[in-house]
């Protein structure tokens, strides 16, 4: 039985009725018990797609839910293993999740089955939910957390998407569940998704990075060990969103999110024009403390006025009136809280918008939802249509995901914000309803290959020493600066390097490495696949493919001064990521779709140039992570000094973070396009997005790996604090070097093709500085001046065009000469 394509099938005593949600490795169905007719939801997980980590999370979720029964926790009714599937039969929550409830709070009047809520509890002007609803949901969430605390459990992923809603309980239900708190005349909240939950003793500390960054405690974002108080920060973020209508802190990535949290210095801002009760403000401020020691504890939270004060049940509607109203709620919910990396999908034959009860109900009532009516994350203005700011929505097609992973929805995740080998991080769960990253911060092994071209690029920079950007870092944790040395990590020589095999340094004394480059290759110990050269093959290539080939297949032999190497590359080949017979931009595509792909290709070229600059610096770091030199190593293979190692790591770190920012721009553009277009994503678009997702995963994992190196090495060697390392400065100066080298080579009459490639790469690097809101540190020079950058790009482009015209003329002249020679030779032969 193929559950992924069939409905009205049976699983034990349950009948599957319709699909209500879909993720990269799980599908959620609405169903019912054949005998009792109880409506339930069935989460069907295809086990072969799960990595070891994800399977452990699933088993943990099952074991936890089997042991707990609470009125404000989603009930696990049954667990059935059938072939390749594990089916979790769970309580069905017909009102969807709290995130959509908050988002559509002003539209309840247009939905007969929900209009009763706004009769007595209208939303606050220019804020969030009605105060009574805020207190009601907070009390029910507190009840669920208090129950978990009694079982020594920490949820680790408290957010609106994991808080599901049911219609108000009946009198019979209340008699069966004396634990119920709050008002019986309001929707009932239930905590769901225990995929990241774990047992944690009061004195224990955890260190795994998981959950959704918008609601994640800063100690987790800083990779510090944390305890159950991390959930309290998440509660504060949820409480703020209920009261205000939006999260307390928003950012395009987790690094910028932490920077904004730190910049706030525990000062929580509330909208001046909205009235929010002082009791609620006080509790929010007590929960949203950066330092866990300053944060209110569980006893303080459970005894707070907001949680303990009984609600006023005064209502113009009786209990029977409410029950009559909610009887009409029969639209299936597609709440993302059931699936860790969720992407909604419409049912075949009965298309419906994703997003659960509320969004579907709007369509059922004939309500037209315009982009301007939806609040969401910022989208660059270049992607907006009709002057409206568009929401950030998950953009990853579920079918395009490789095998499973634990990594945006951004997205997932942006995330989003989607997978391959069992340990590879991807961005499928990033962008999960704008909560864009779900990762484990420990270095993870993967078979994904590093580019050999990056092994030699920039080796001319003082051998193995870092670029002369001596600067450092004073604690500003952002894409422009490296992380703070606030705690130690395990010794880096024992770390597993991302995308490398453990213990990859061979002990064979006959393996002689004469340069750091060959030592690095020895460390990688991987076979890579060739990428077709830009001139090979008669097939028509897209700009994205050409850009990738330019930046990879020729990077090593063109960009590096005085060094060539015809090694292989690890960037996705046509066989692996881009279909062999597909040209990404096809003439038959609609103009809007073609424009989208043009934008994606442009961003891909800019992102790829920054990514490889980061790869070069990472390649110089790897050989120094070995504890001792190997037989046959030369002086050039001598490890870097701790200071040089940390400086190189900082430079590589900020470049990977910049690459992540560029990739997020692409995700935002796709989200904006889909929000304003009724077109379905073409296979070409899905392939392009898949490439962005995989690159996002790689950059994120490597940046985290470098962060651990920086912290551990700085702590181990007591390195002095230096000035912040600027990604913009690194990119700017490298672009200048490339353009100067290309101009010098051109004047010397050297390889014209190599000069062209250097010009192109320099232009892409400079263009990346103009993409999105990329700020530079105070005091930055011309690299912070967009006018200067645009002028440089214009000059480089002009030089490139002149050189191309010279090449064309030279080719024509050569052909003429050859033709004349043949004509002259013909009579002689005769």
Curated annotation (Swiss-Prot):
Descriptive protein name: Serine/threonine-protein kinase atg1
Function: Serine/threonine protein kinase involved in the cytoplasm to vacuole transport (Cvt) and found to be essential in autophagy, where it is required for the formation of autophagosomes. Involved in the clearance of protein aggregates which cannot be efficiently cleared by the proteasome. Required for selective autophagic degradation of the nucleus (nucleophagy) as well as for mitophagy which contributes to regulate mitochondrial quantity and quality by eliminating the mitochondria to a basal level to fulfill cellular energy requirements and preventing excess ROS production.
GO terms of biological process kind: autophagosome assembly; macroautophagy; mitophagy; piecemeal microautophagy of the nucleus; protein transport; regulation of autophagy; response to starvation; reticulophagy
Superkingdom of source: Eukaryota
Phenotype of null mutants: Impairs atg8-processing.
GN (gene name): atg1
Stored Pfam families: ATG1-like_MIT1, ATG1-like_MIT2, Pkinase
Modification Phosphoserine, positions: 346
Known partners and oligomeric status: Homodimer. Component of the atg1 kinase complex composed of at least atg1, atg13, atg17 and atg101. Interacts directly with atg13.
Source organism per UniProt: Schizosaccharomyces pombe (strain 972 / ATCC 24843)
GO CC annotation terms, alphabetical: Atg1/ULK1 kinase complex; autophagosome; cytoplasm; cytosol; fungal-type vacuole membrane; nucleus; phagophore assembly site; phagophore assembly site membrane
Family: Belongs to the protein kinase superfamily. Ser/Thr protein kinase family. APG1/unc-51/ULK1 subfamily.
Entry annotation: catalytic residues: 157
Domain Protein kinase residues, every copy: 14-307
SUPFAM superfamilies linked to this entry: Protein kinase-like (PK-like)
GO molecular function: ATP binding; protein serine kinase activity; protein serine/threonine kinase activity
Top class in the EC scheme: transferase
Catalysis performed (reactions): L-seryl-[protein] + ATP = O-phospho-L-seryl-[protein] + ADP + H(+); L-threonyl-[protein] + ATP = O-phospho-L-threonyl-[protein] + ADP + H(+)
Annotated keywords: ATP-binding, Autophagy, Kinase, Nucleotide-binding, Phosphoprotein, Protein transport, Serine/threonine-protein kinase, Transferase, Transport
EC identifiers of the protein: 2.7.11.1
PROSITE patterns assigned: PROTEIN_KINASE_DOM, PROTEIN_KINASE_ST
Entries under PANTHER family matching the protein: NON-SPECIFIC SERINE_THREONINE PROTEIN KINASE, SERINE/THREONINE-PROTEIN KINASE UNC-51-RELATED
PTM comment: Phosphorylated. Dephosphorylated under depletion of nitrogen.
